[in-house]
Amino acid sequence: MEAAFTTGFAEGRDIGAAVAVVVDRQLVVDLWGGHRDRRKTQPWERDTLCCLFSASKGITALCVLQAVAEGKLMLDEPLAEVWPGFGVNGKEAVTLRQVLDHQAGLIGFHEPVSAELLYDWSAVCSALERESPWWEPGTLHGYHARTFGFLLGEALRLATGSTPAGWLADRLAIPHALDLHFGLAGADLDRCAQMVPARVQAGSDATPESSRDLIEAMRDPKTPTGAAFQNPSMGPGYMNSERFRRAEMPAMNGHGTARDLATLYARMPELLPDEVLREATTTQSSGADQVLKSFTRFGLGFMLYDDRAPIGVRPGSFGHAGAGGSMAFYDPDARVGFCFVMNQMQQGVVTGGASAI
């Protein structure tokens, strides 16, 4: 694994990165290297924090599933039972399960919105109350790239009094000594890696074939893909701004280390009852993804292994990938938790160093 990890630097694919493997609760691989800034002046250190992008979704799903296990949220009751203002405009019967498995049809906003919206929890939740589904909930599935975290997070807040940031801190990070966060503050801001965007060239030979349809579809904000990823447009370099790092966007801006996210996945069997974990890792939706324009397979908040969309290395693995190449998963048969994070982003949904390792 060390050879595969260092190859990313030798080939110029990575600027800075970290990878960790936990087996039976024992940390057996813990590698980091390179630099945490584009100019390569600051070394990537043991405690460097990296933006996890959509690998954050697995953390948010765990928070919500713990609330389900405690009877505070119900998978198959209308979300409007805990969020009364939500149950309008075709959303009356939308369930928590449909949000977790990306069948709710609430992938984005029909009308143009400003990036300011995503920094205001109350405002974005009010906007979601006014939205209508892009398809009949439960009939199709499509990746809820940004809305996933707000929809689940508001349900969690109304049912328990905690948003994902609070639940993560109080129930997971602090008790288990995990360096994982939604919303950074103080000295933690100074530990962040600078994310370097991938070069996106639609139709270019440099663009992975699996990503070309996705990149083309992103160009039109009136399509499900464009609405999910480009409405609002966040602007260049947003992921490195202090404002973004301080915000709570539970689908896209978790920060942490590879070591601690691998550890979290390795402890999944302790963190969820068997019956909840079993259901969460059973296929809930699969097939043509209306947003990602490719095959995807989801459990309850987790991506599930499929040879067409590999999360892990074999059937049974579950976890989540993040934009640019990060990935975290648990392999229950081998009892292995894995995580790879990096700051040089690549194109594609599951790509880059994680796939190579």
Where are these regions (language model features)?
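The feature captures the short pre-catalytic strand/loop hairpin that immediately precedes
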Residues: 39, 125-134, 234-245
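Active-site-proximal alpha-helical segments within enzyme catalytic domains
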Residues: 102, 148-155, 248, 252-272, ...
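Short, conserved catalytic-motif segment at the N-terminal edge
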Residues: 1-53
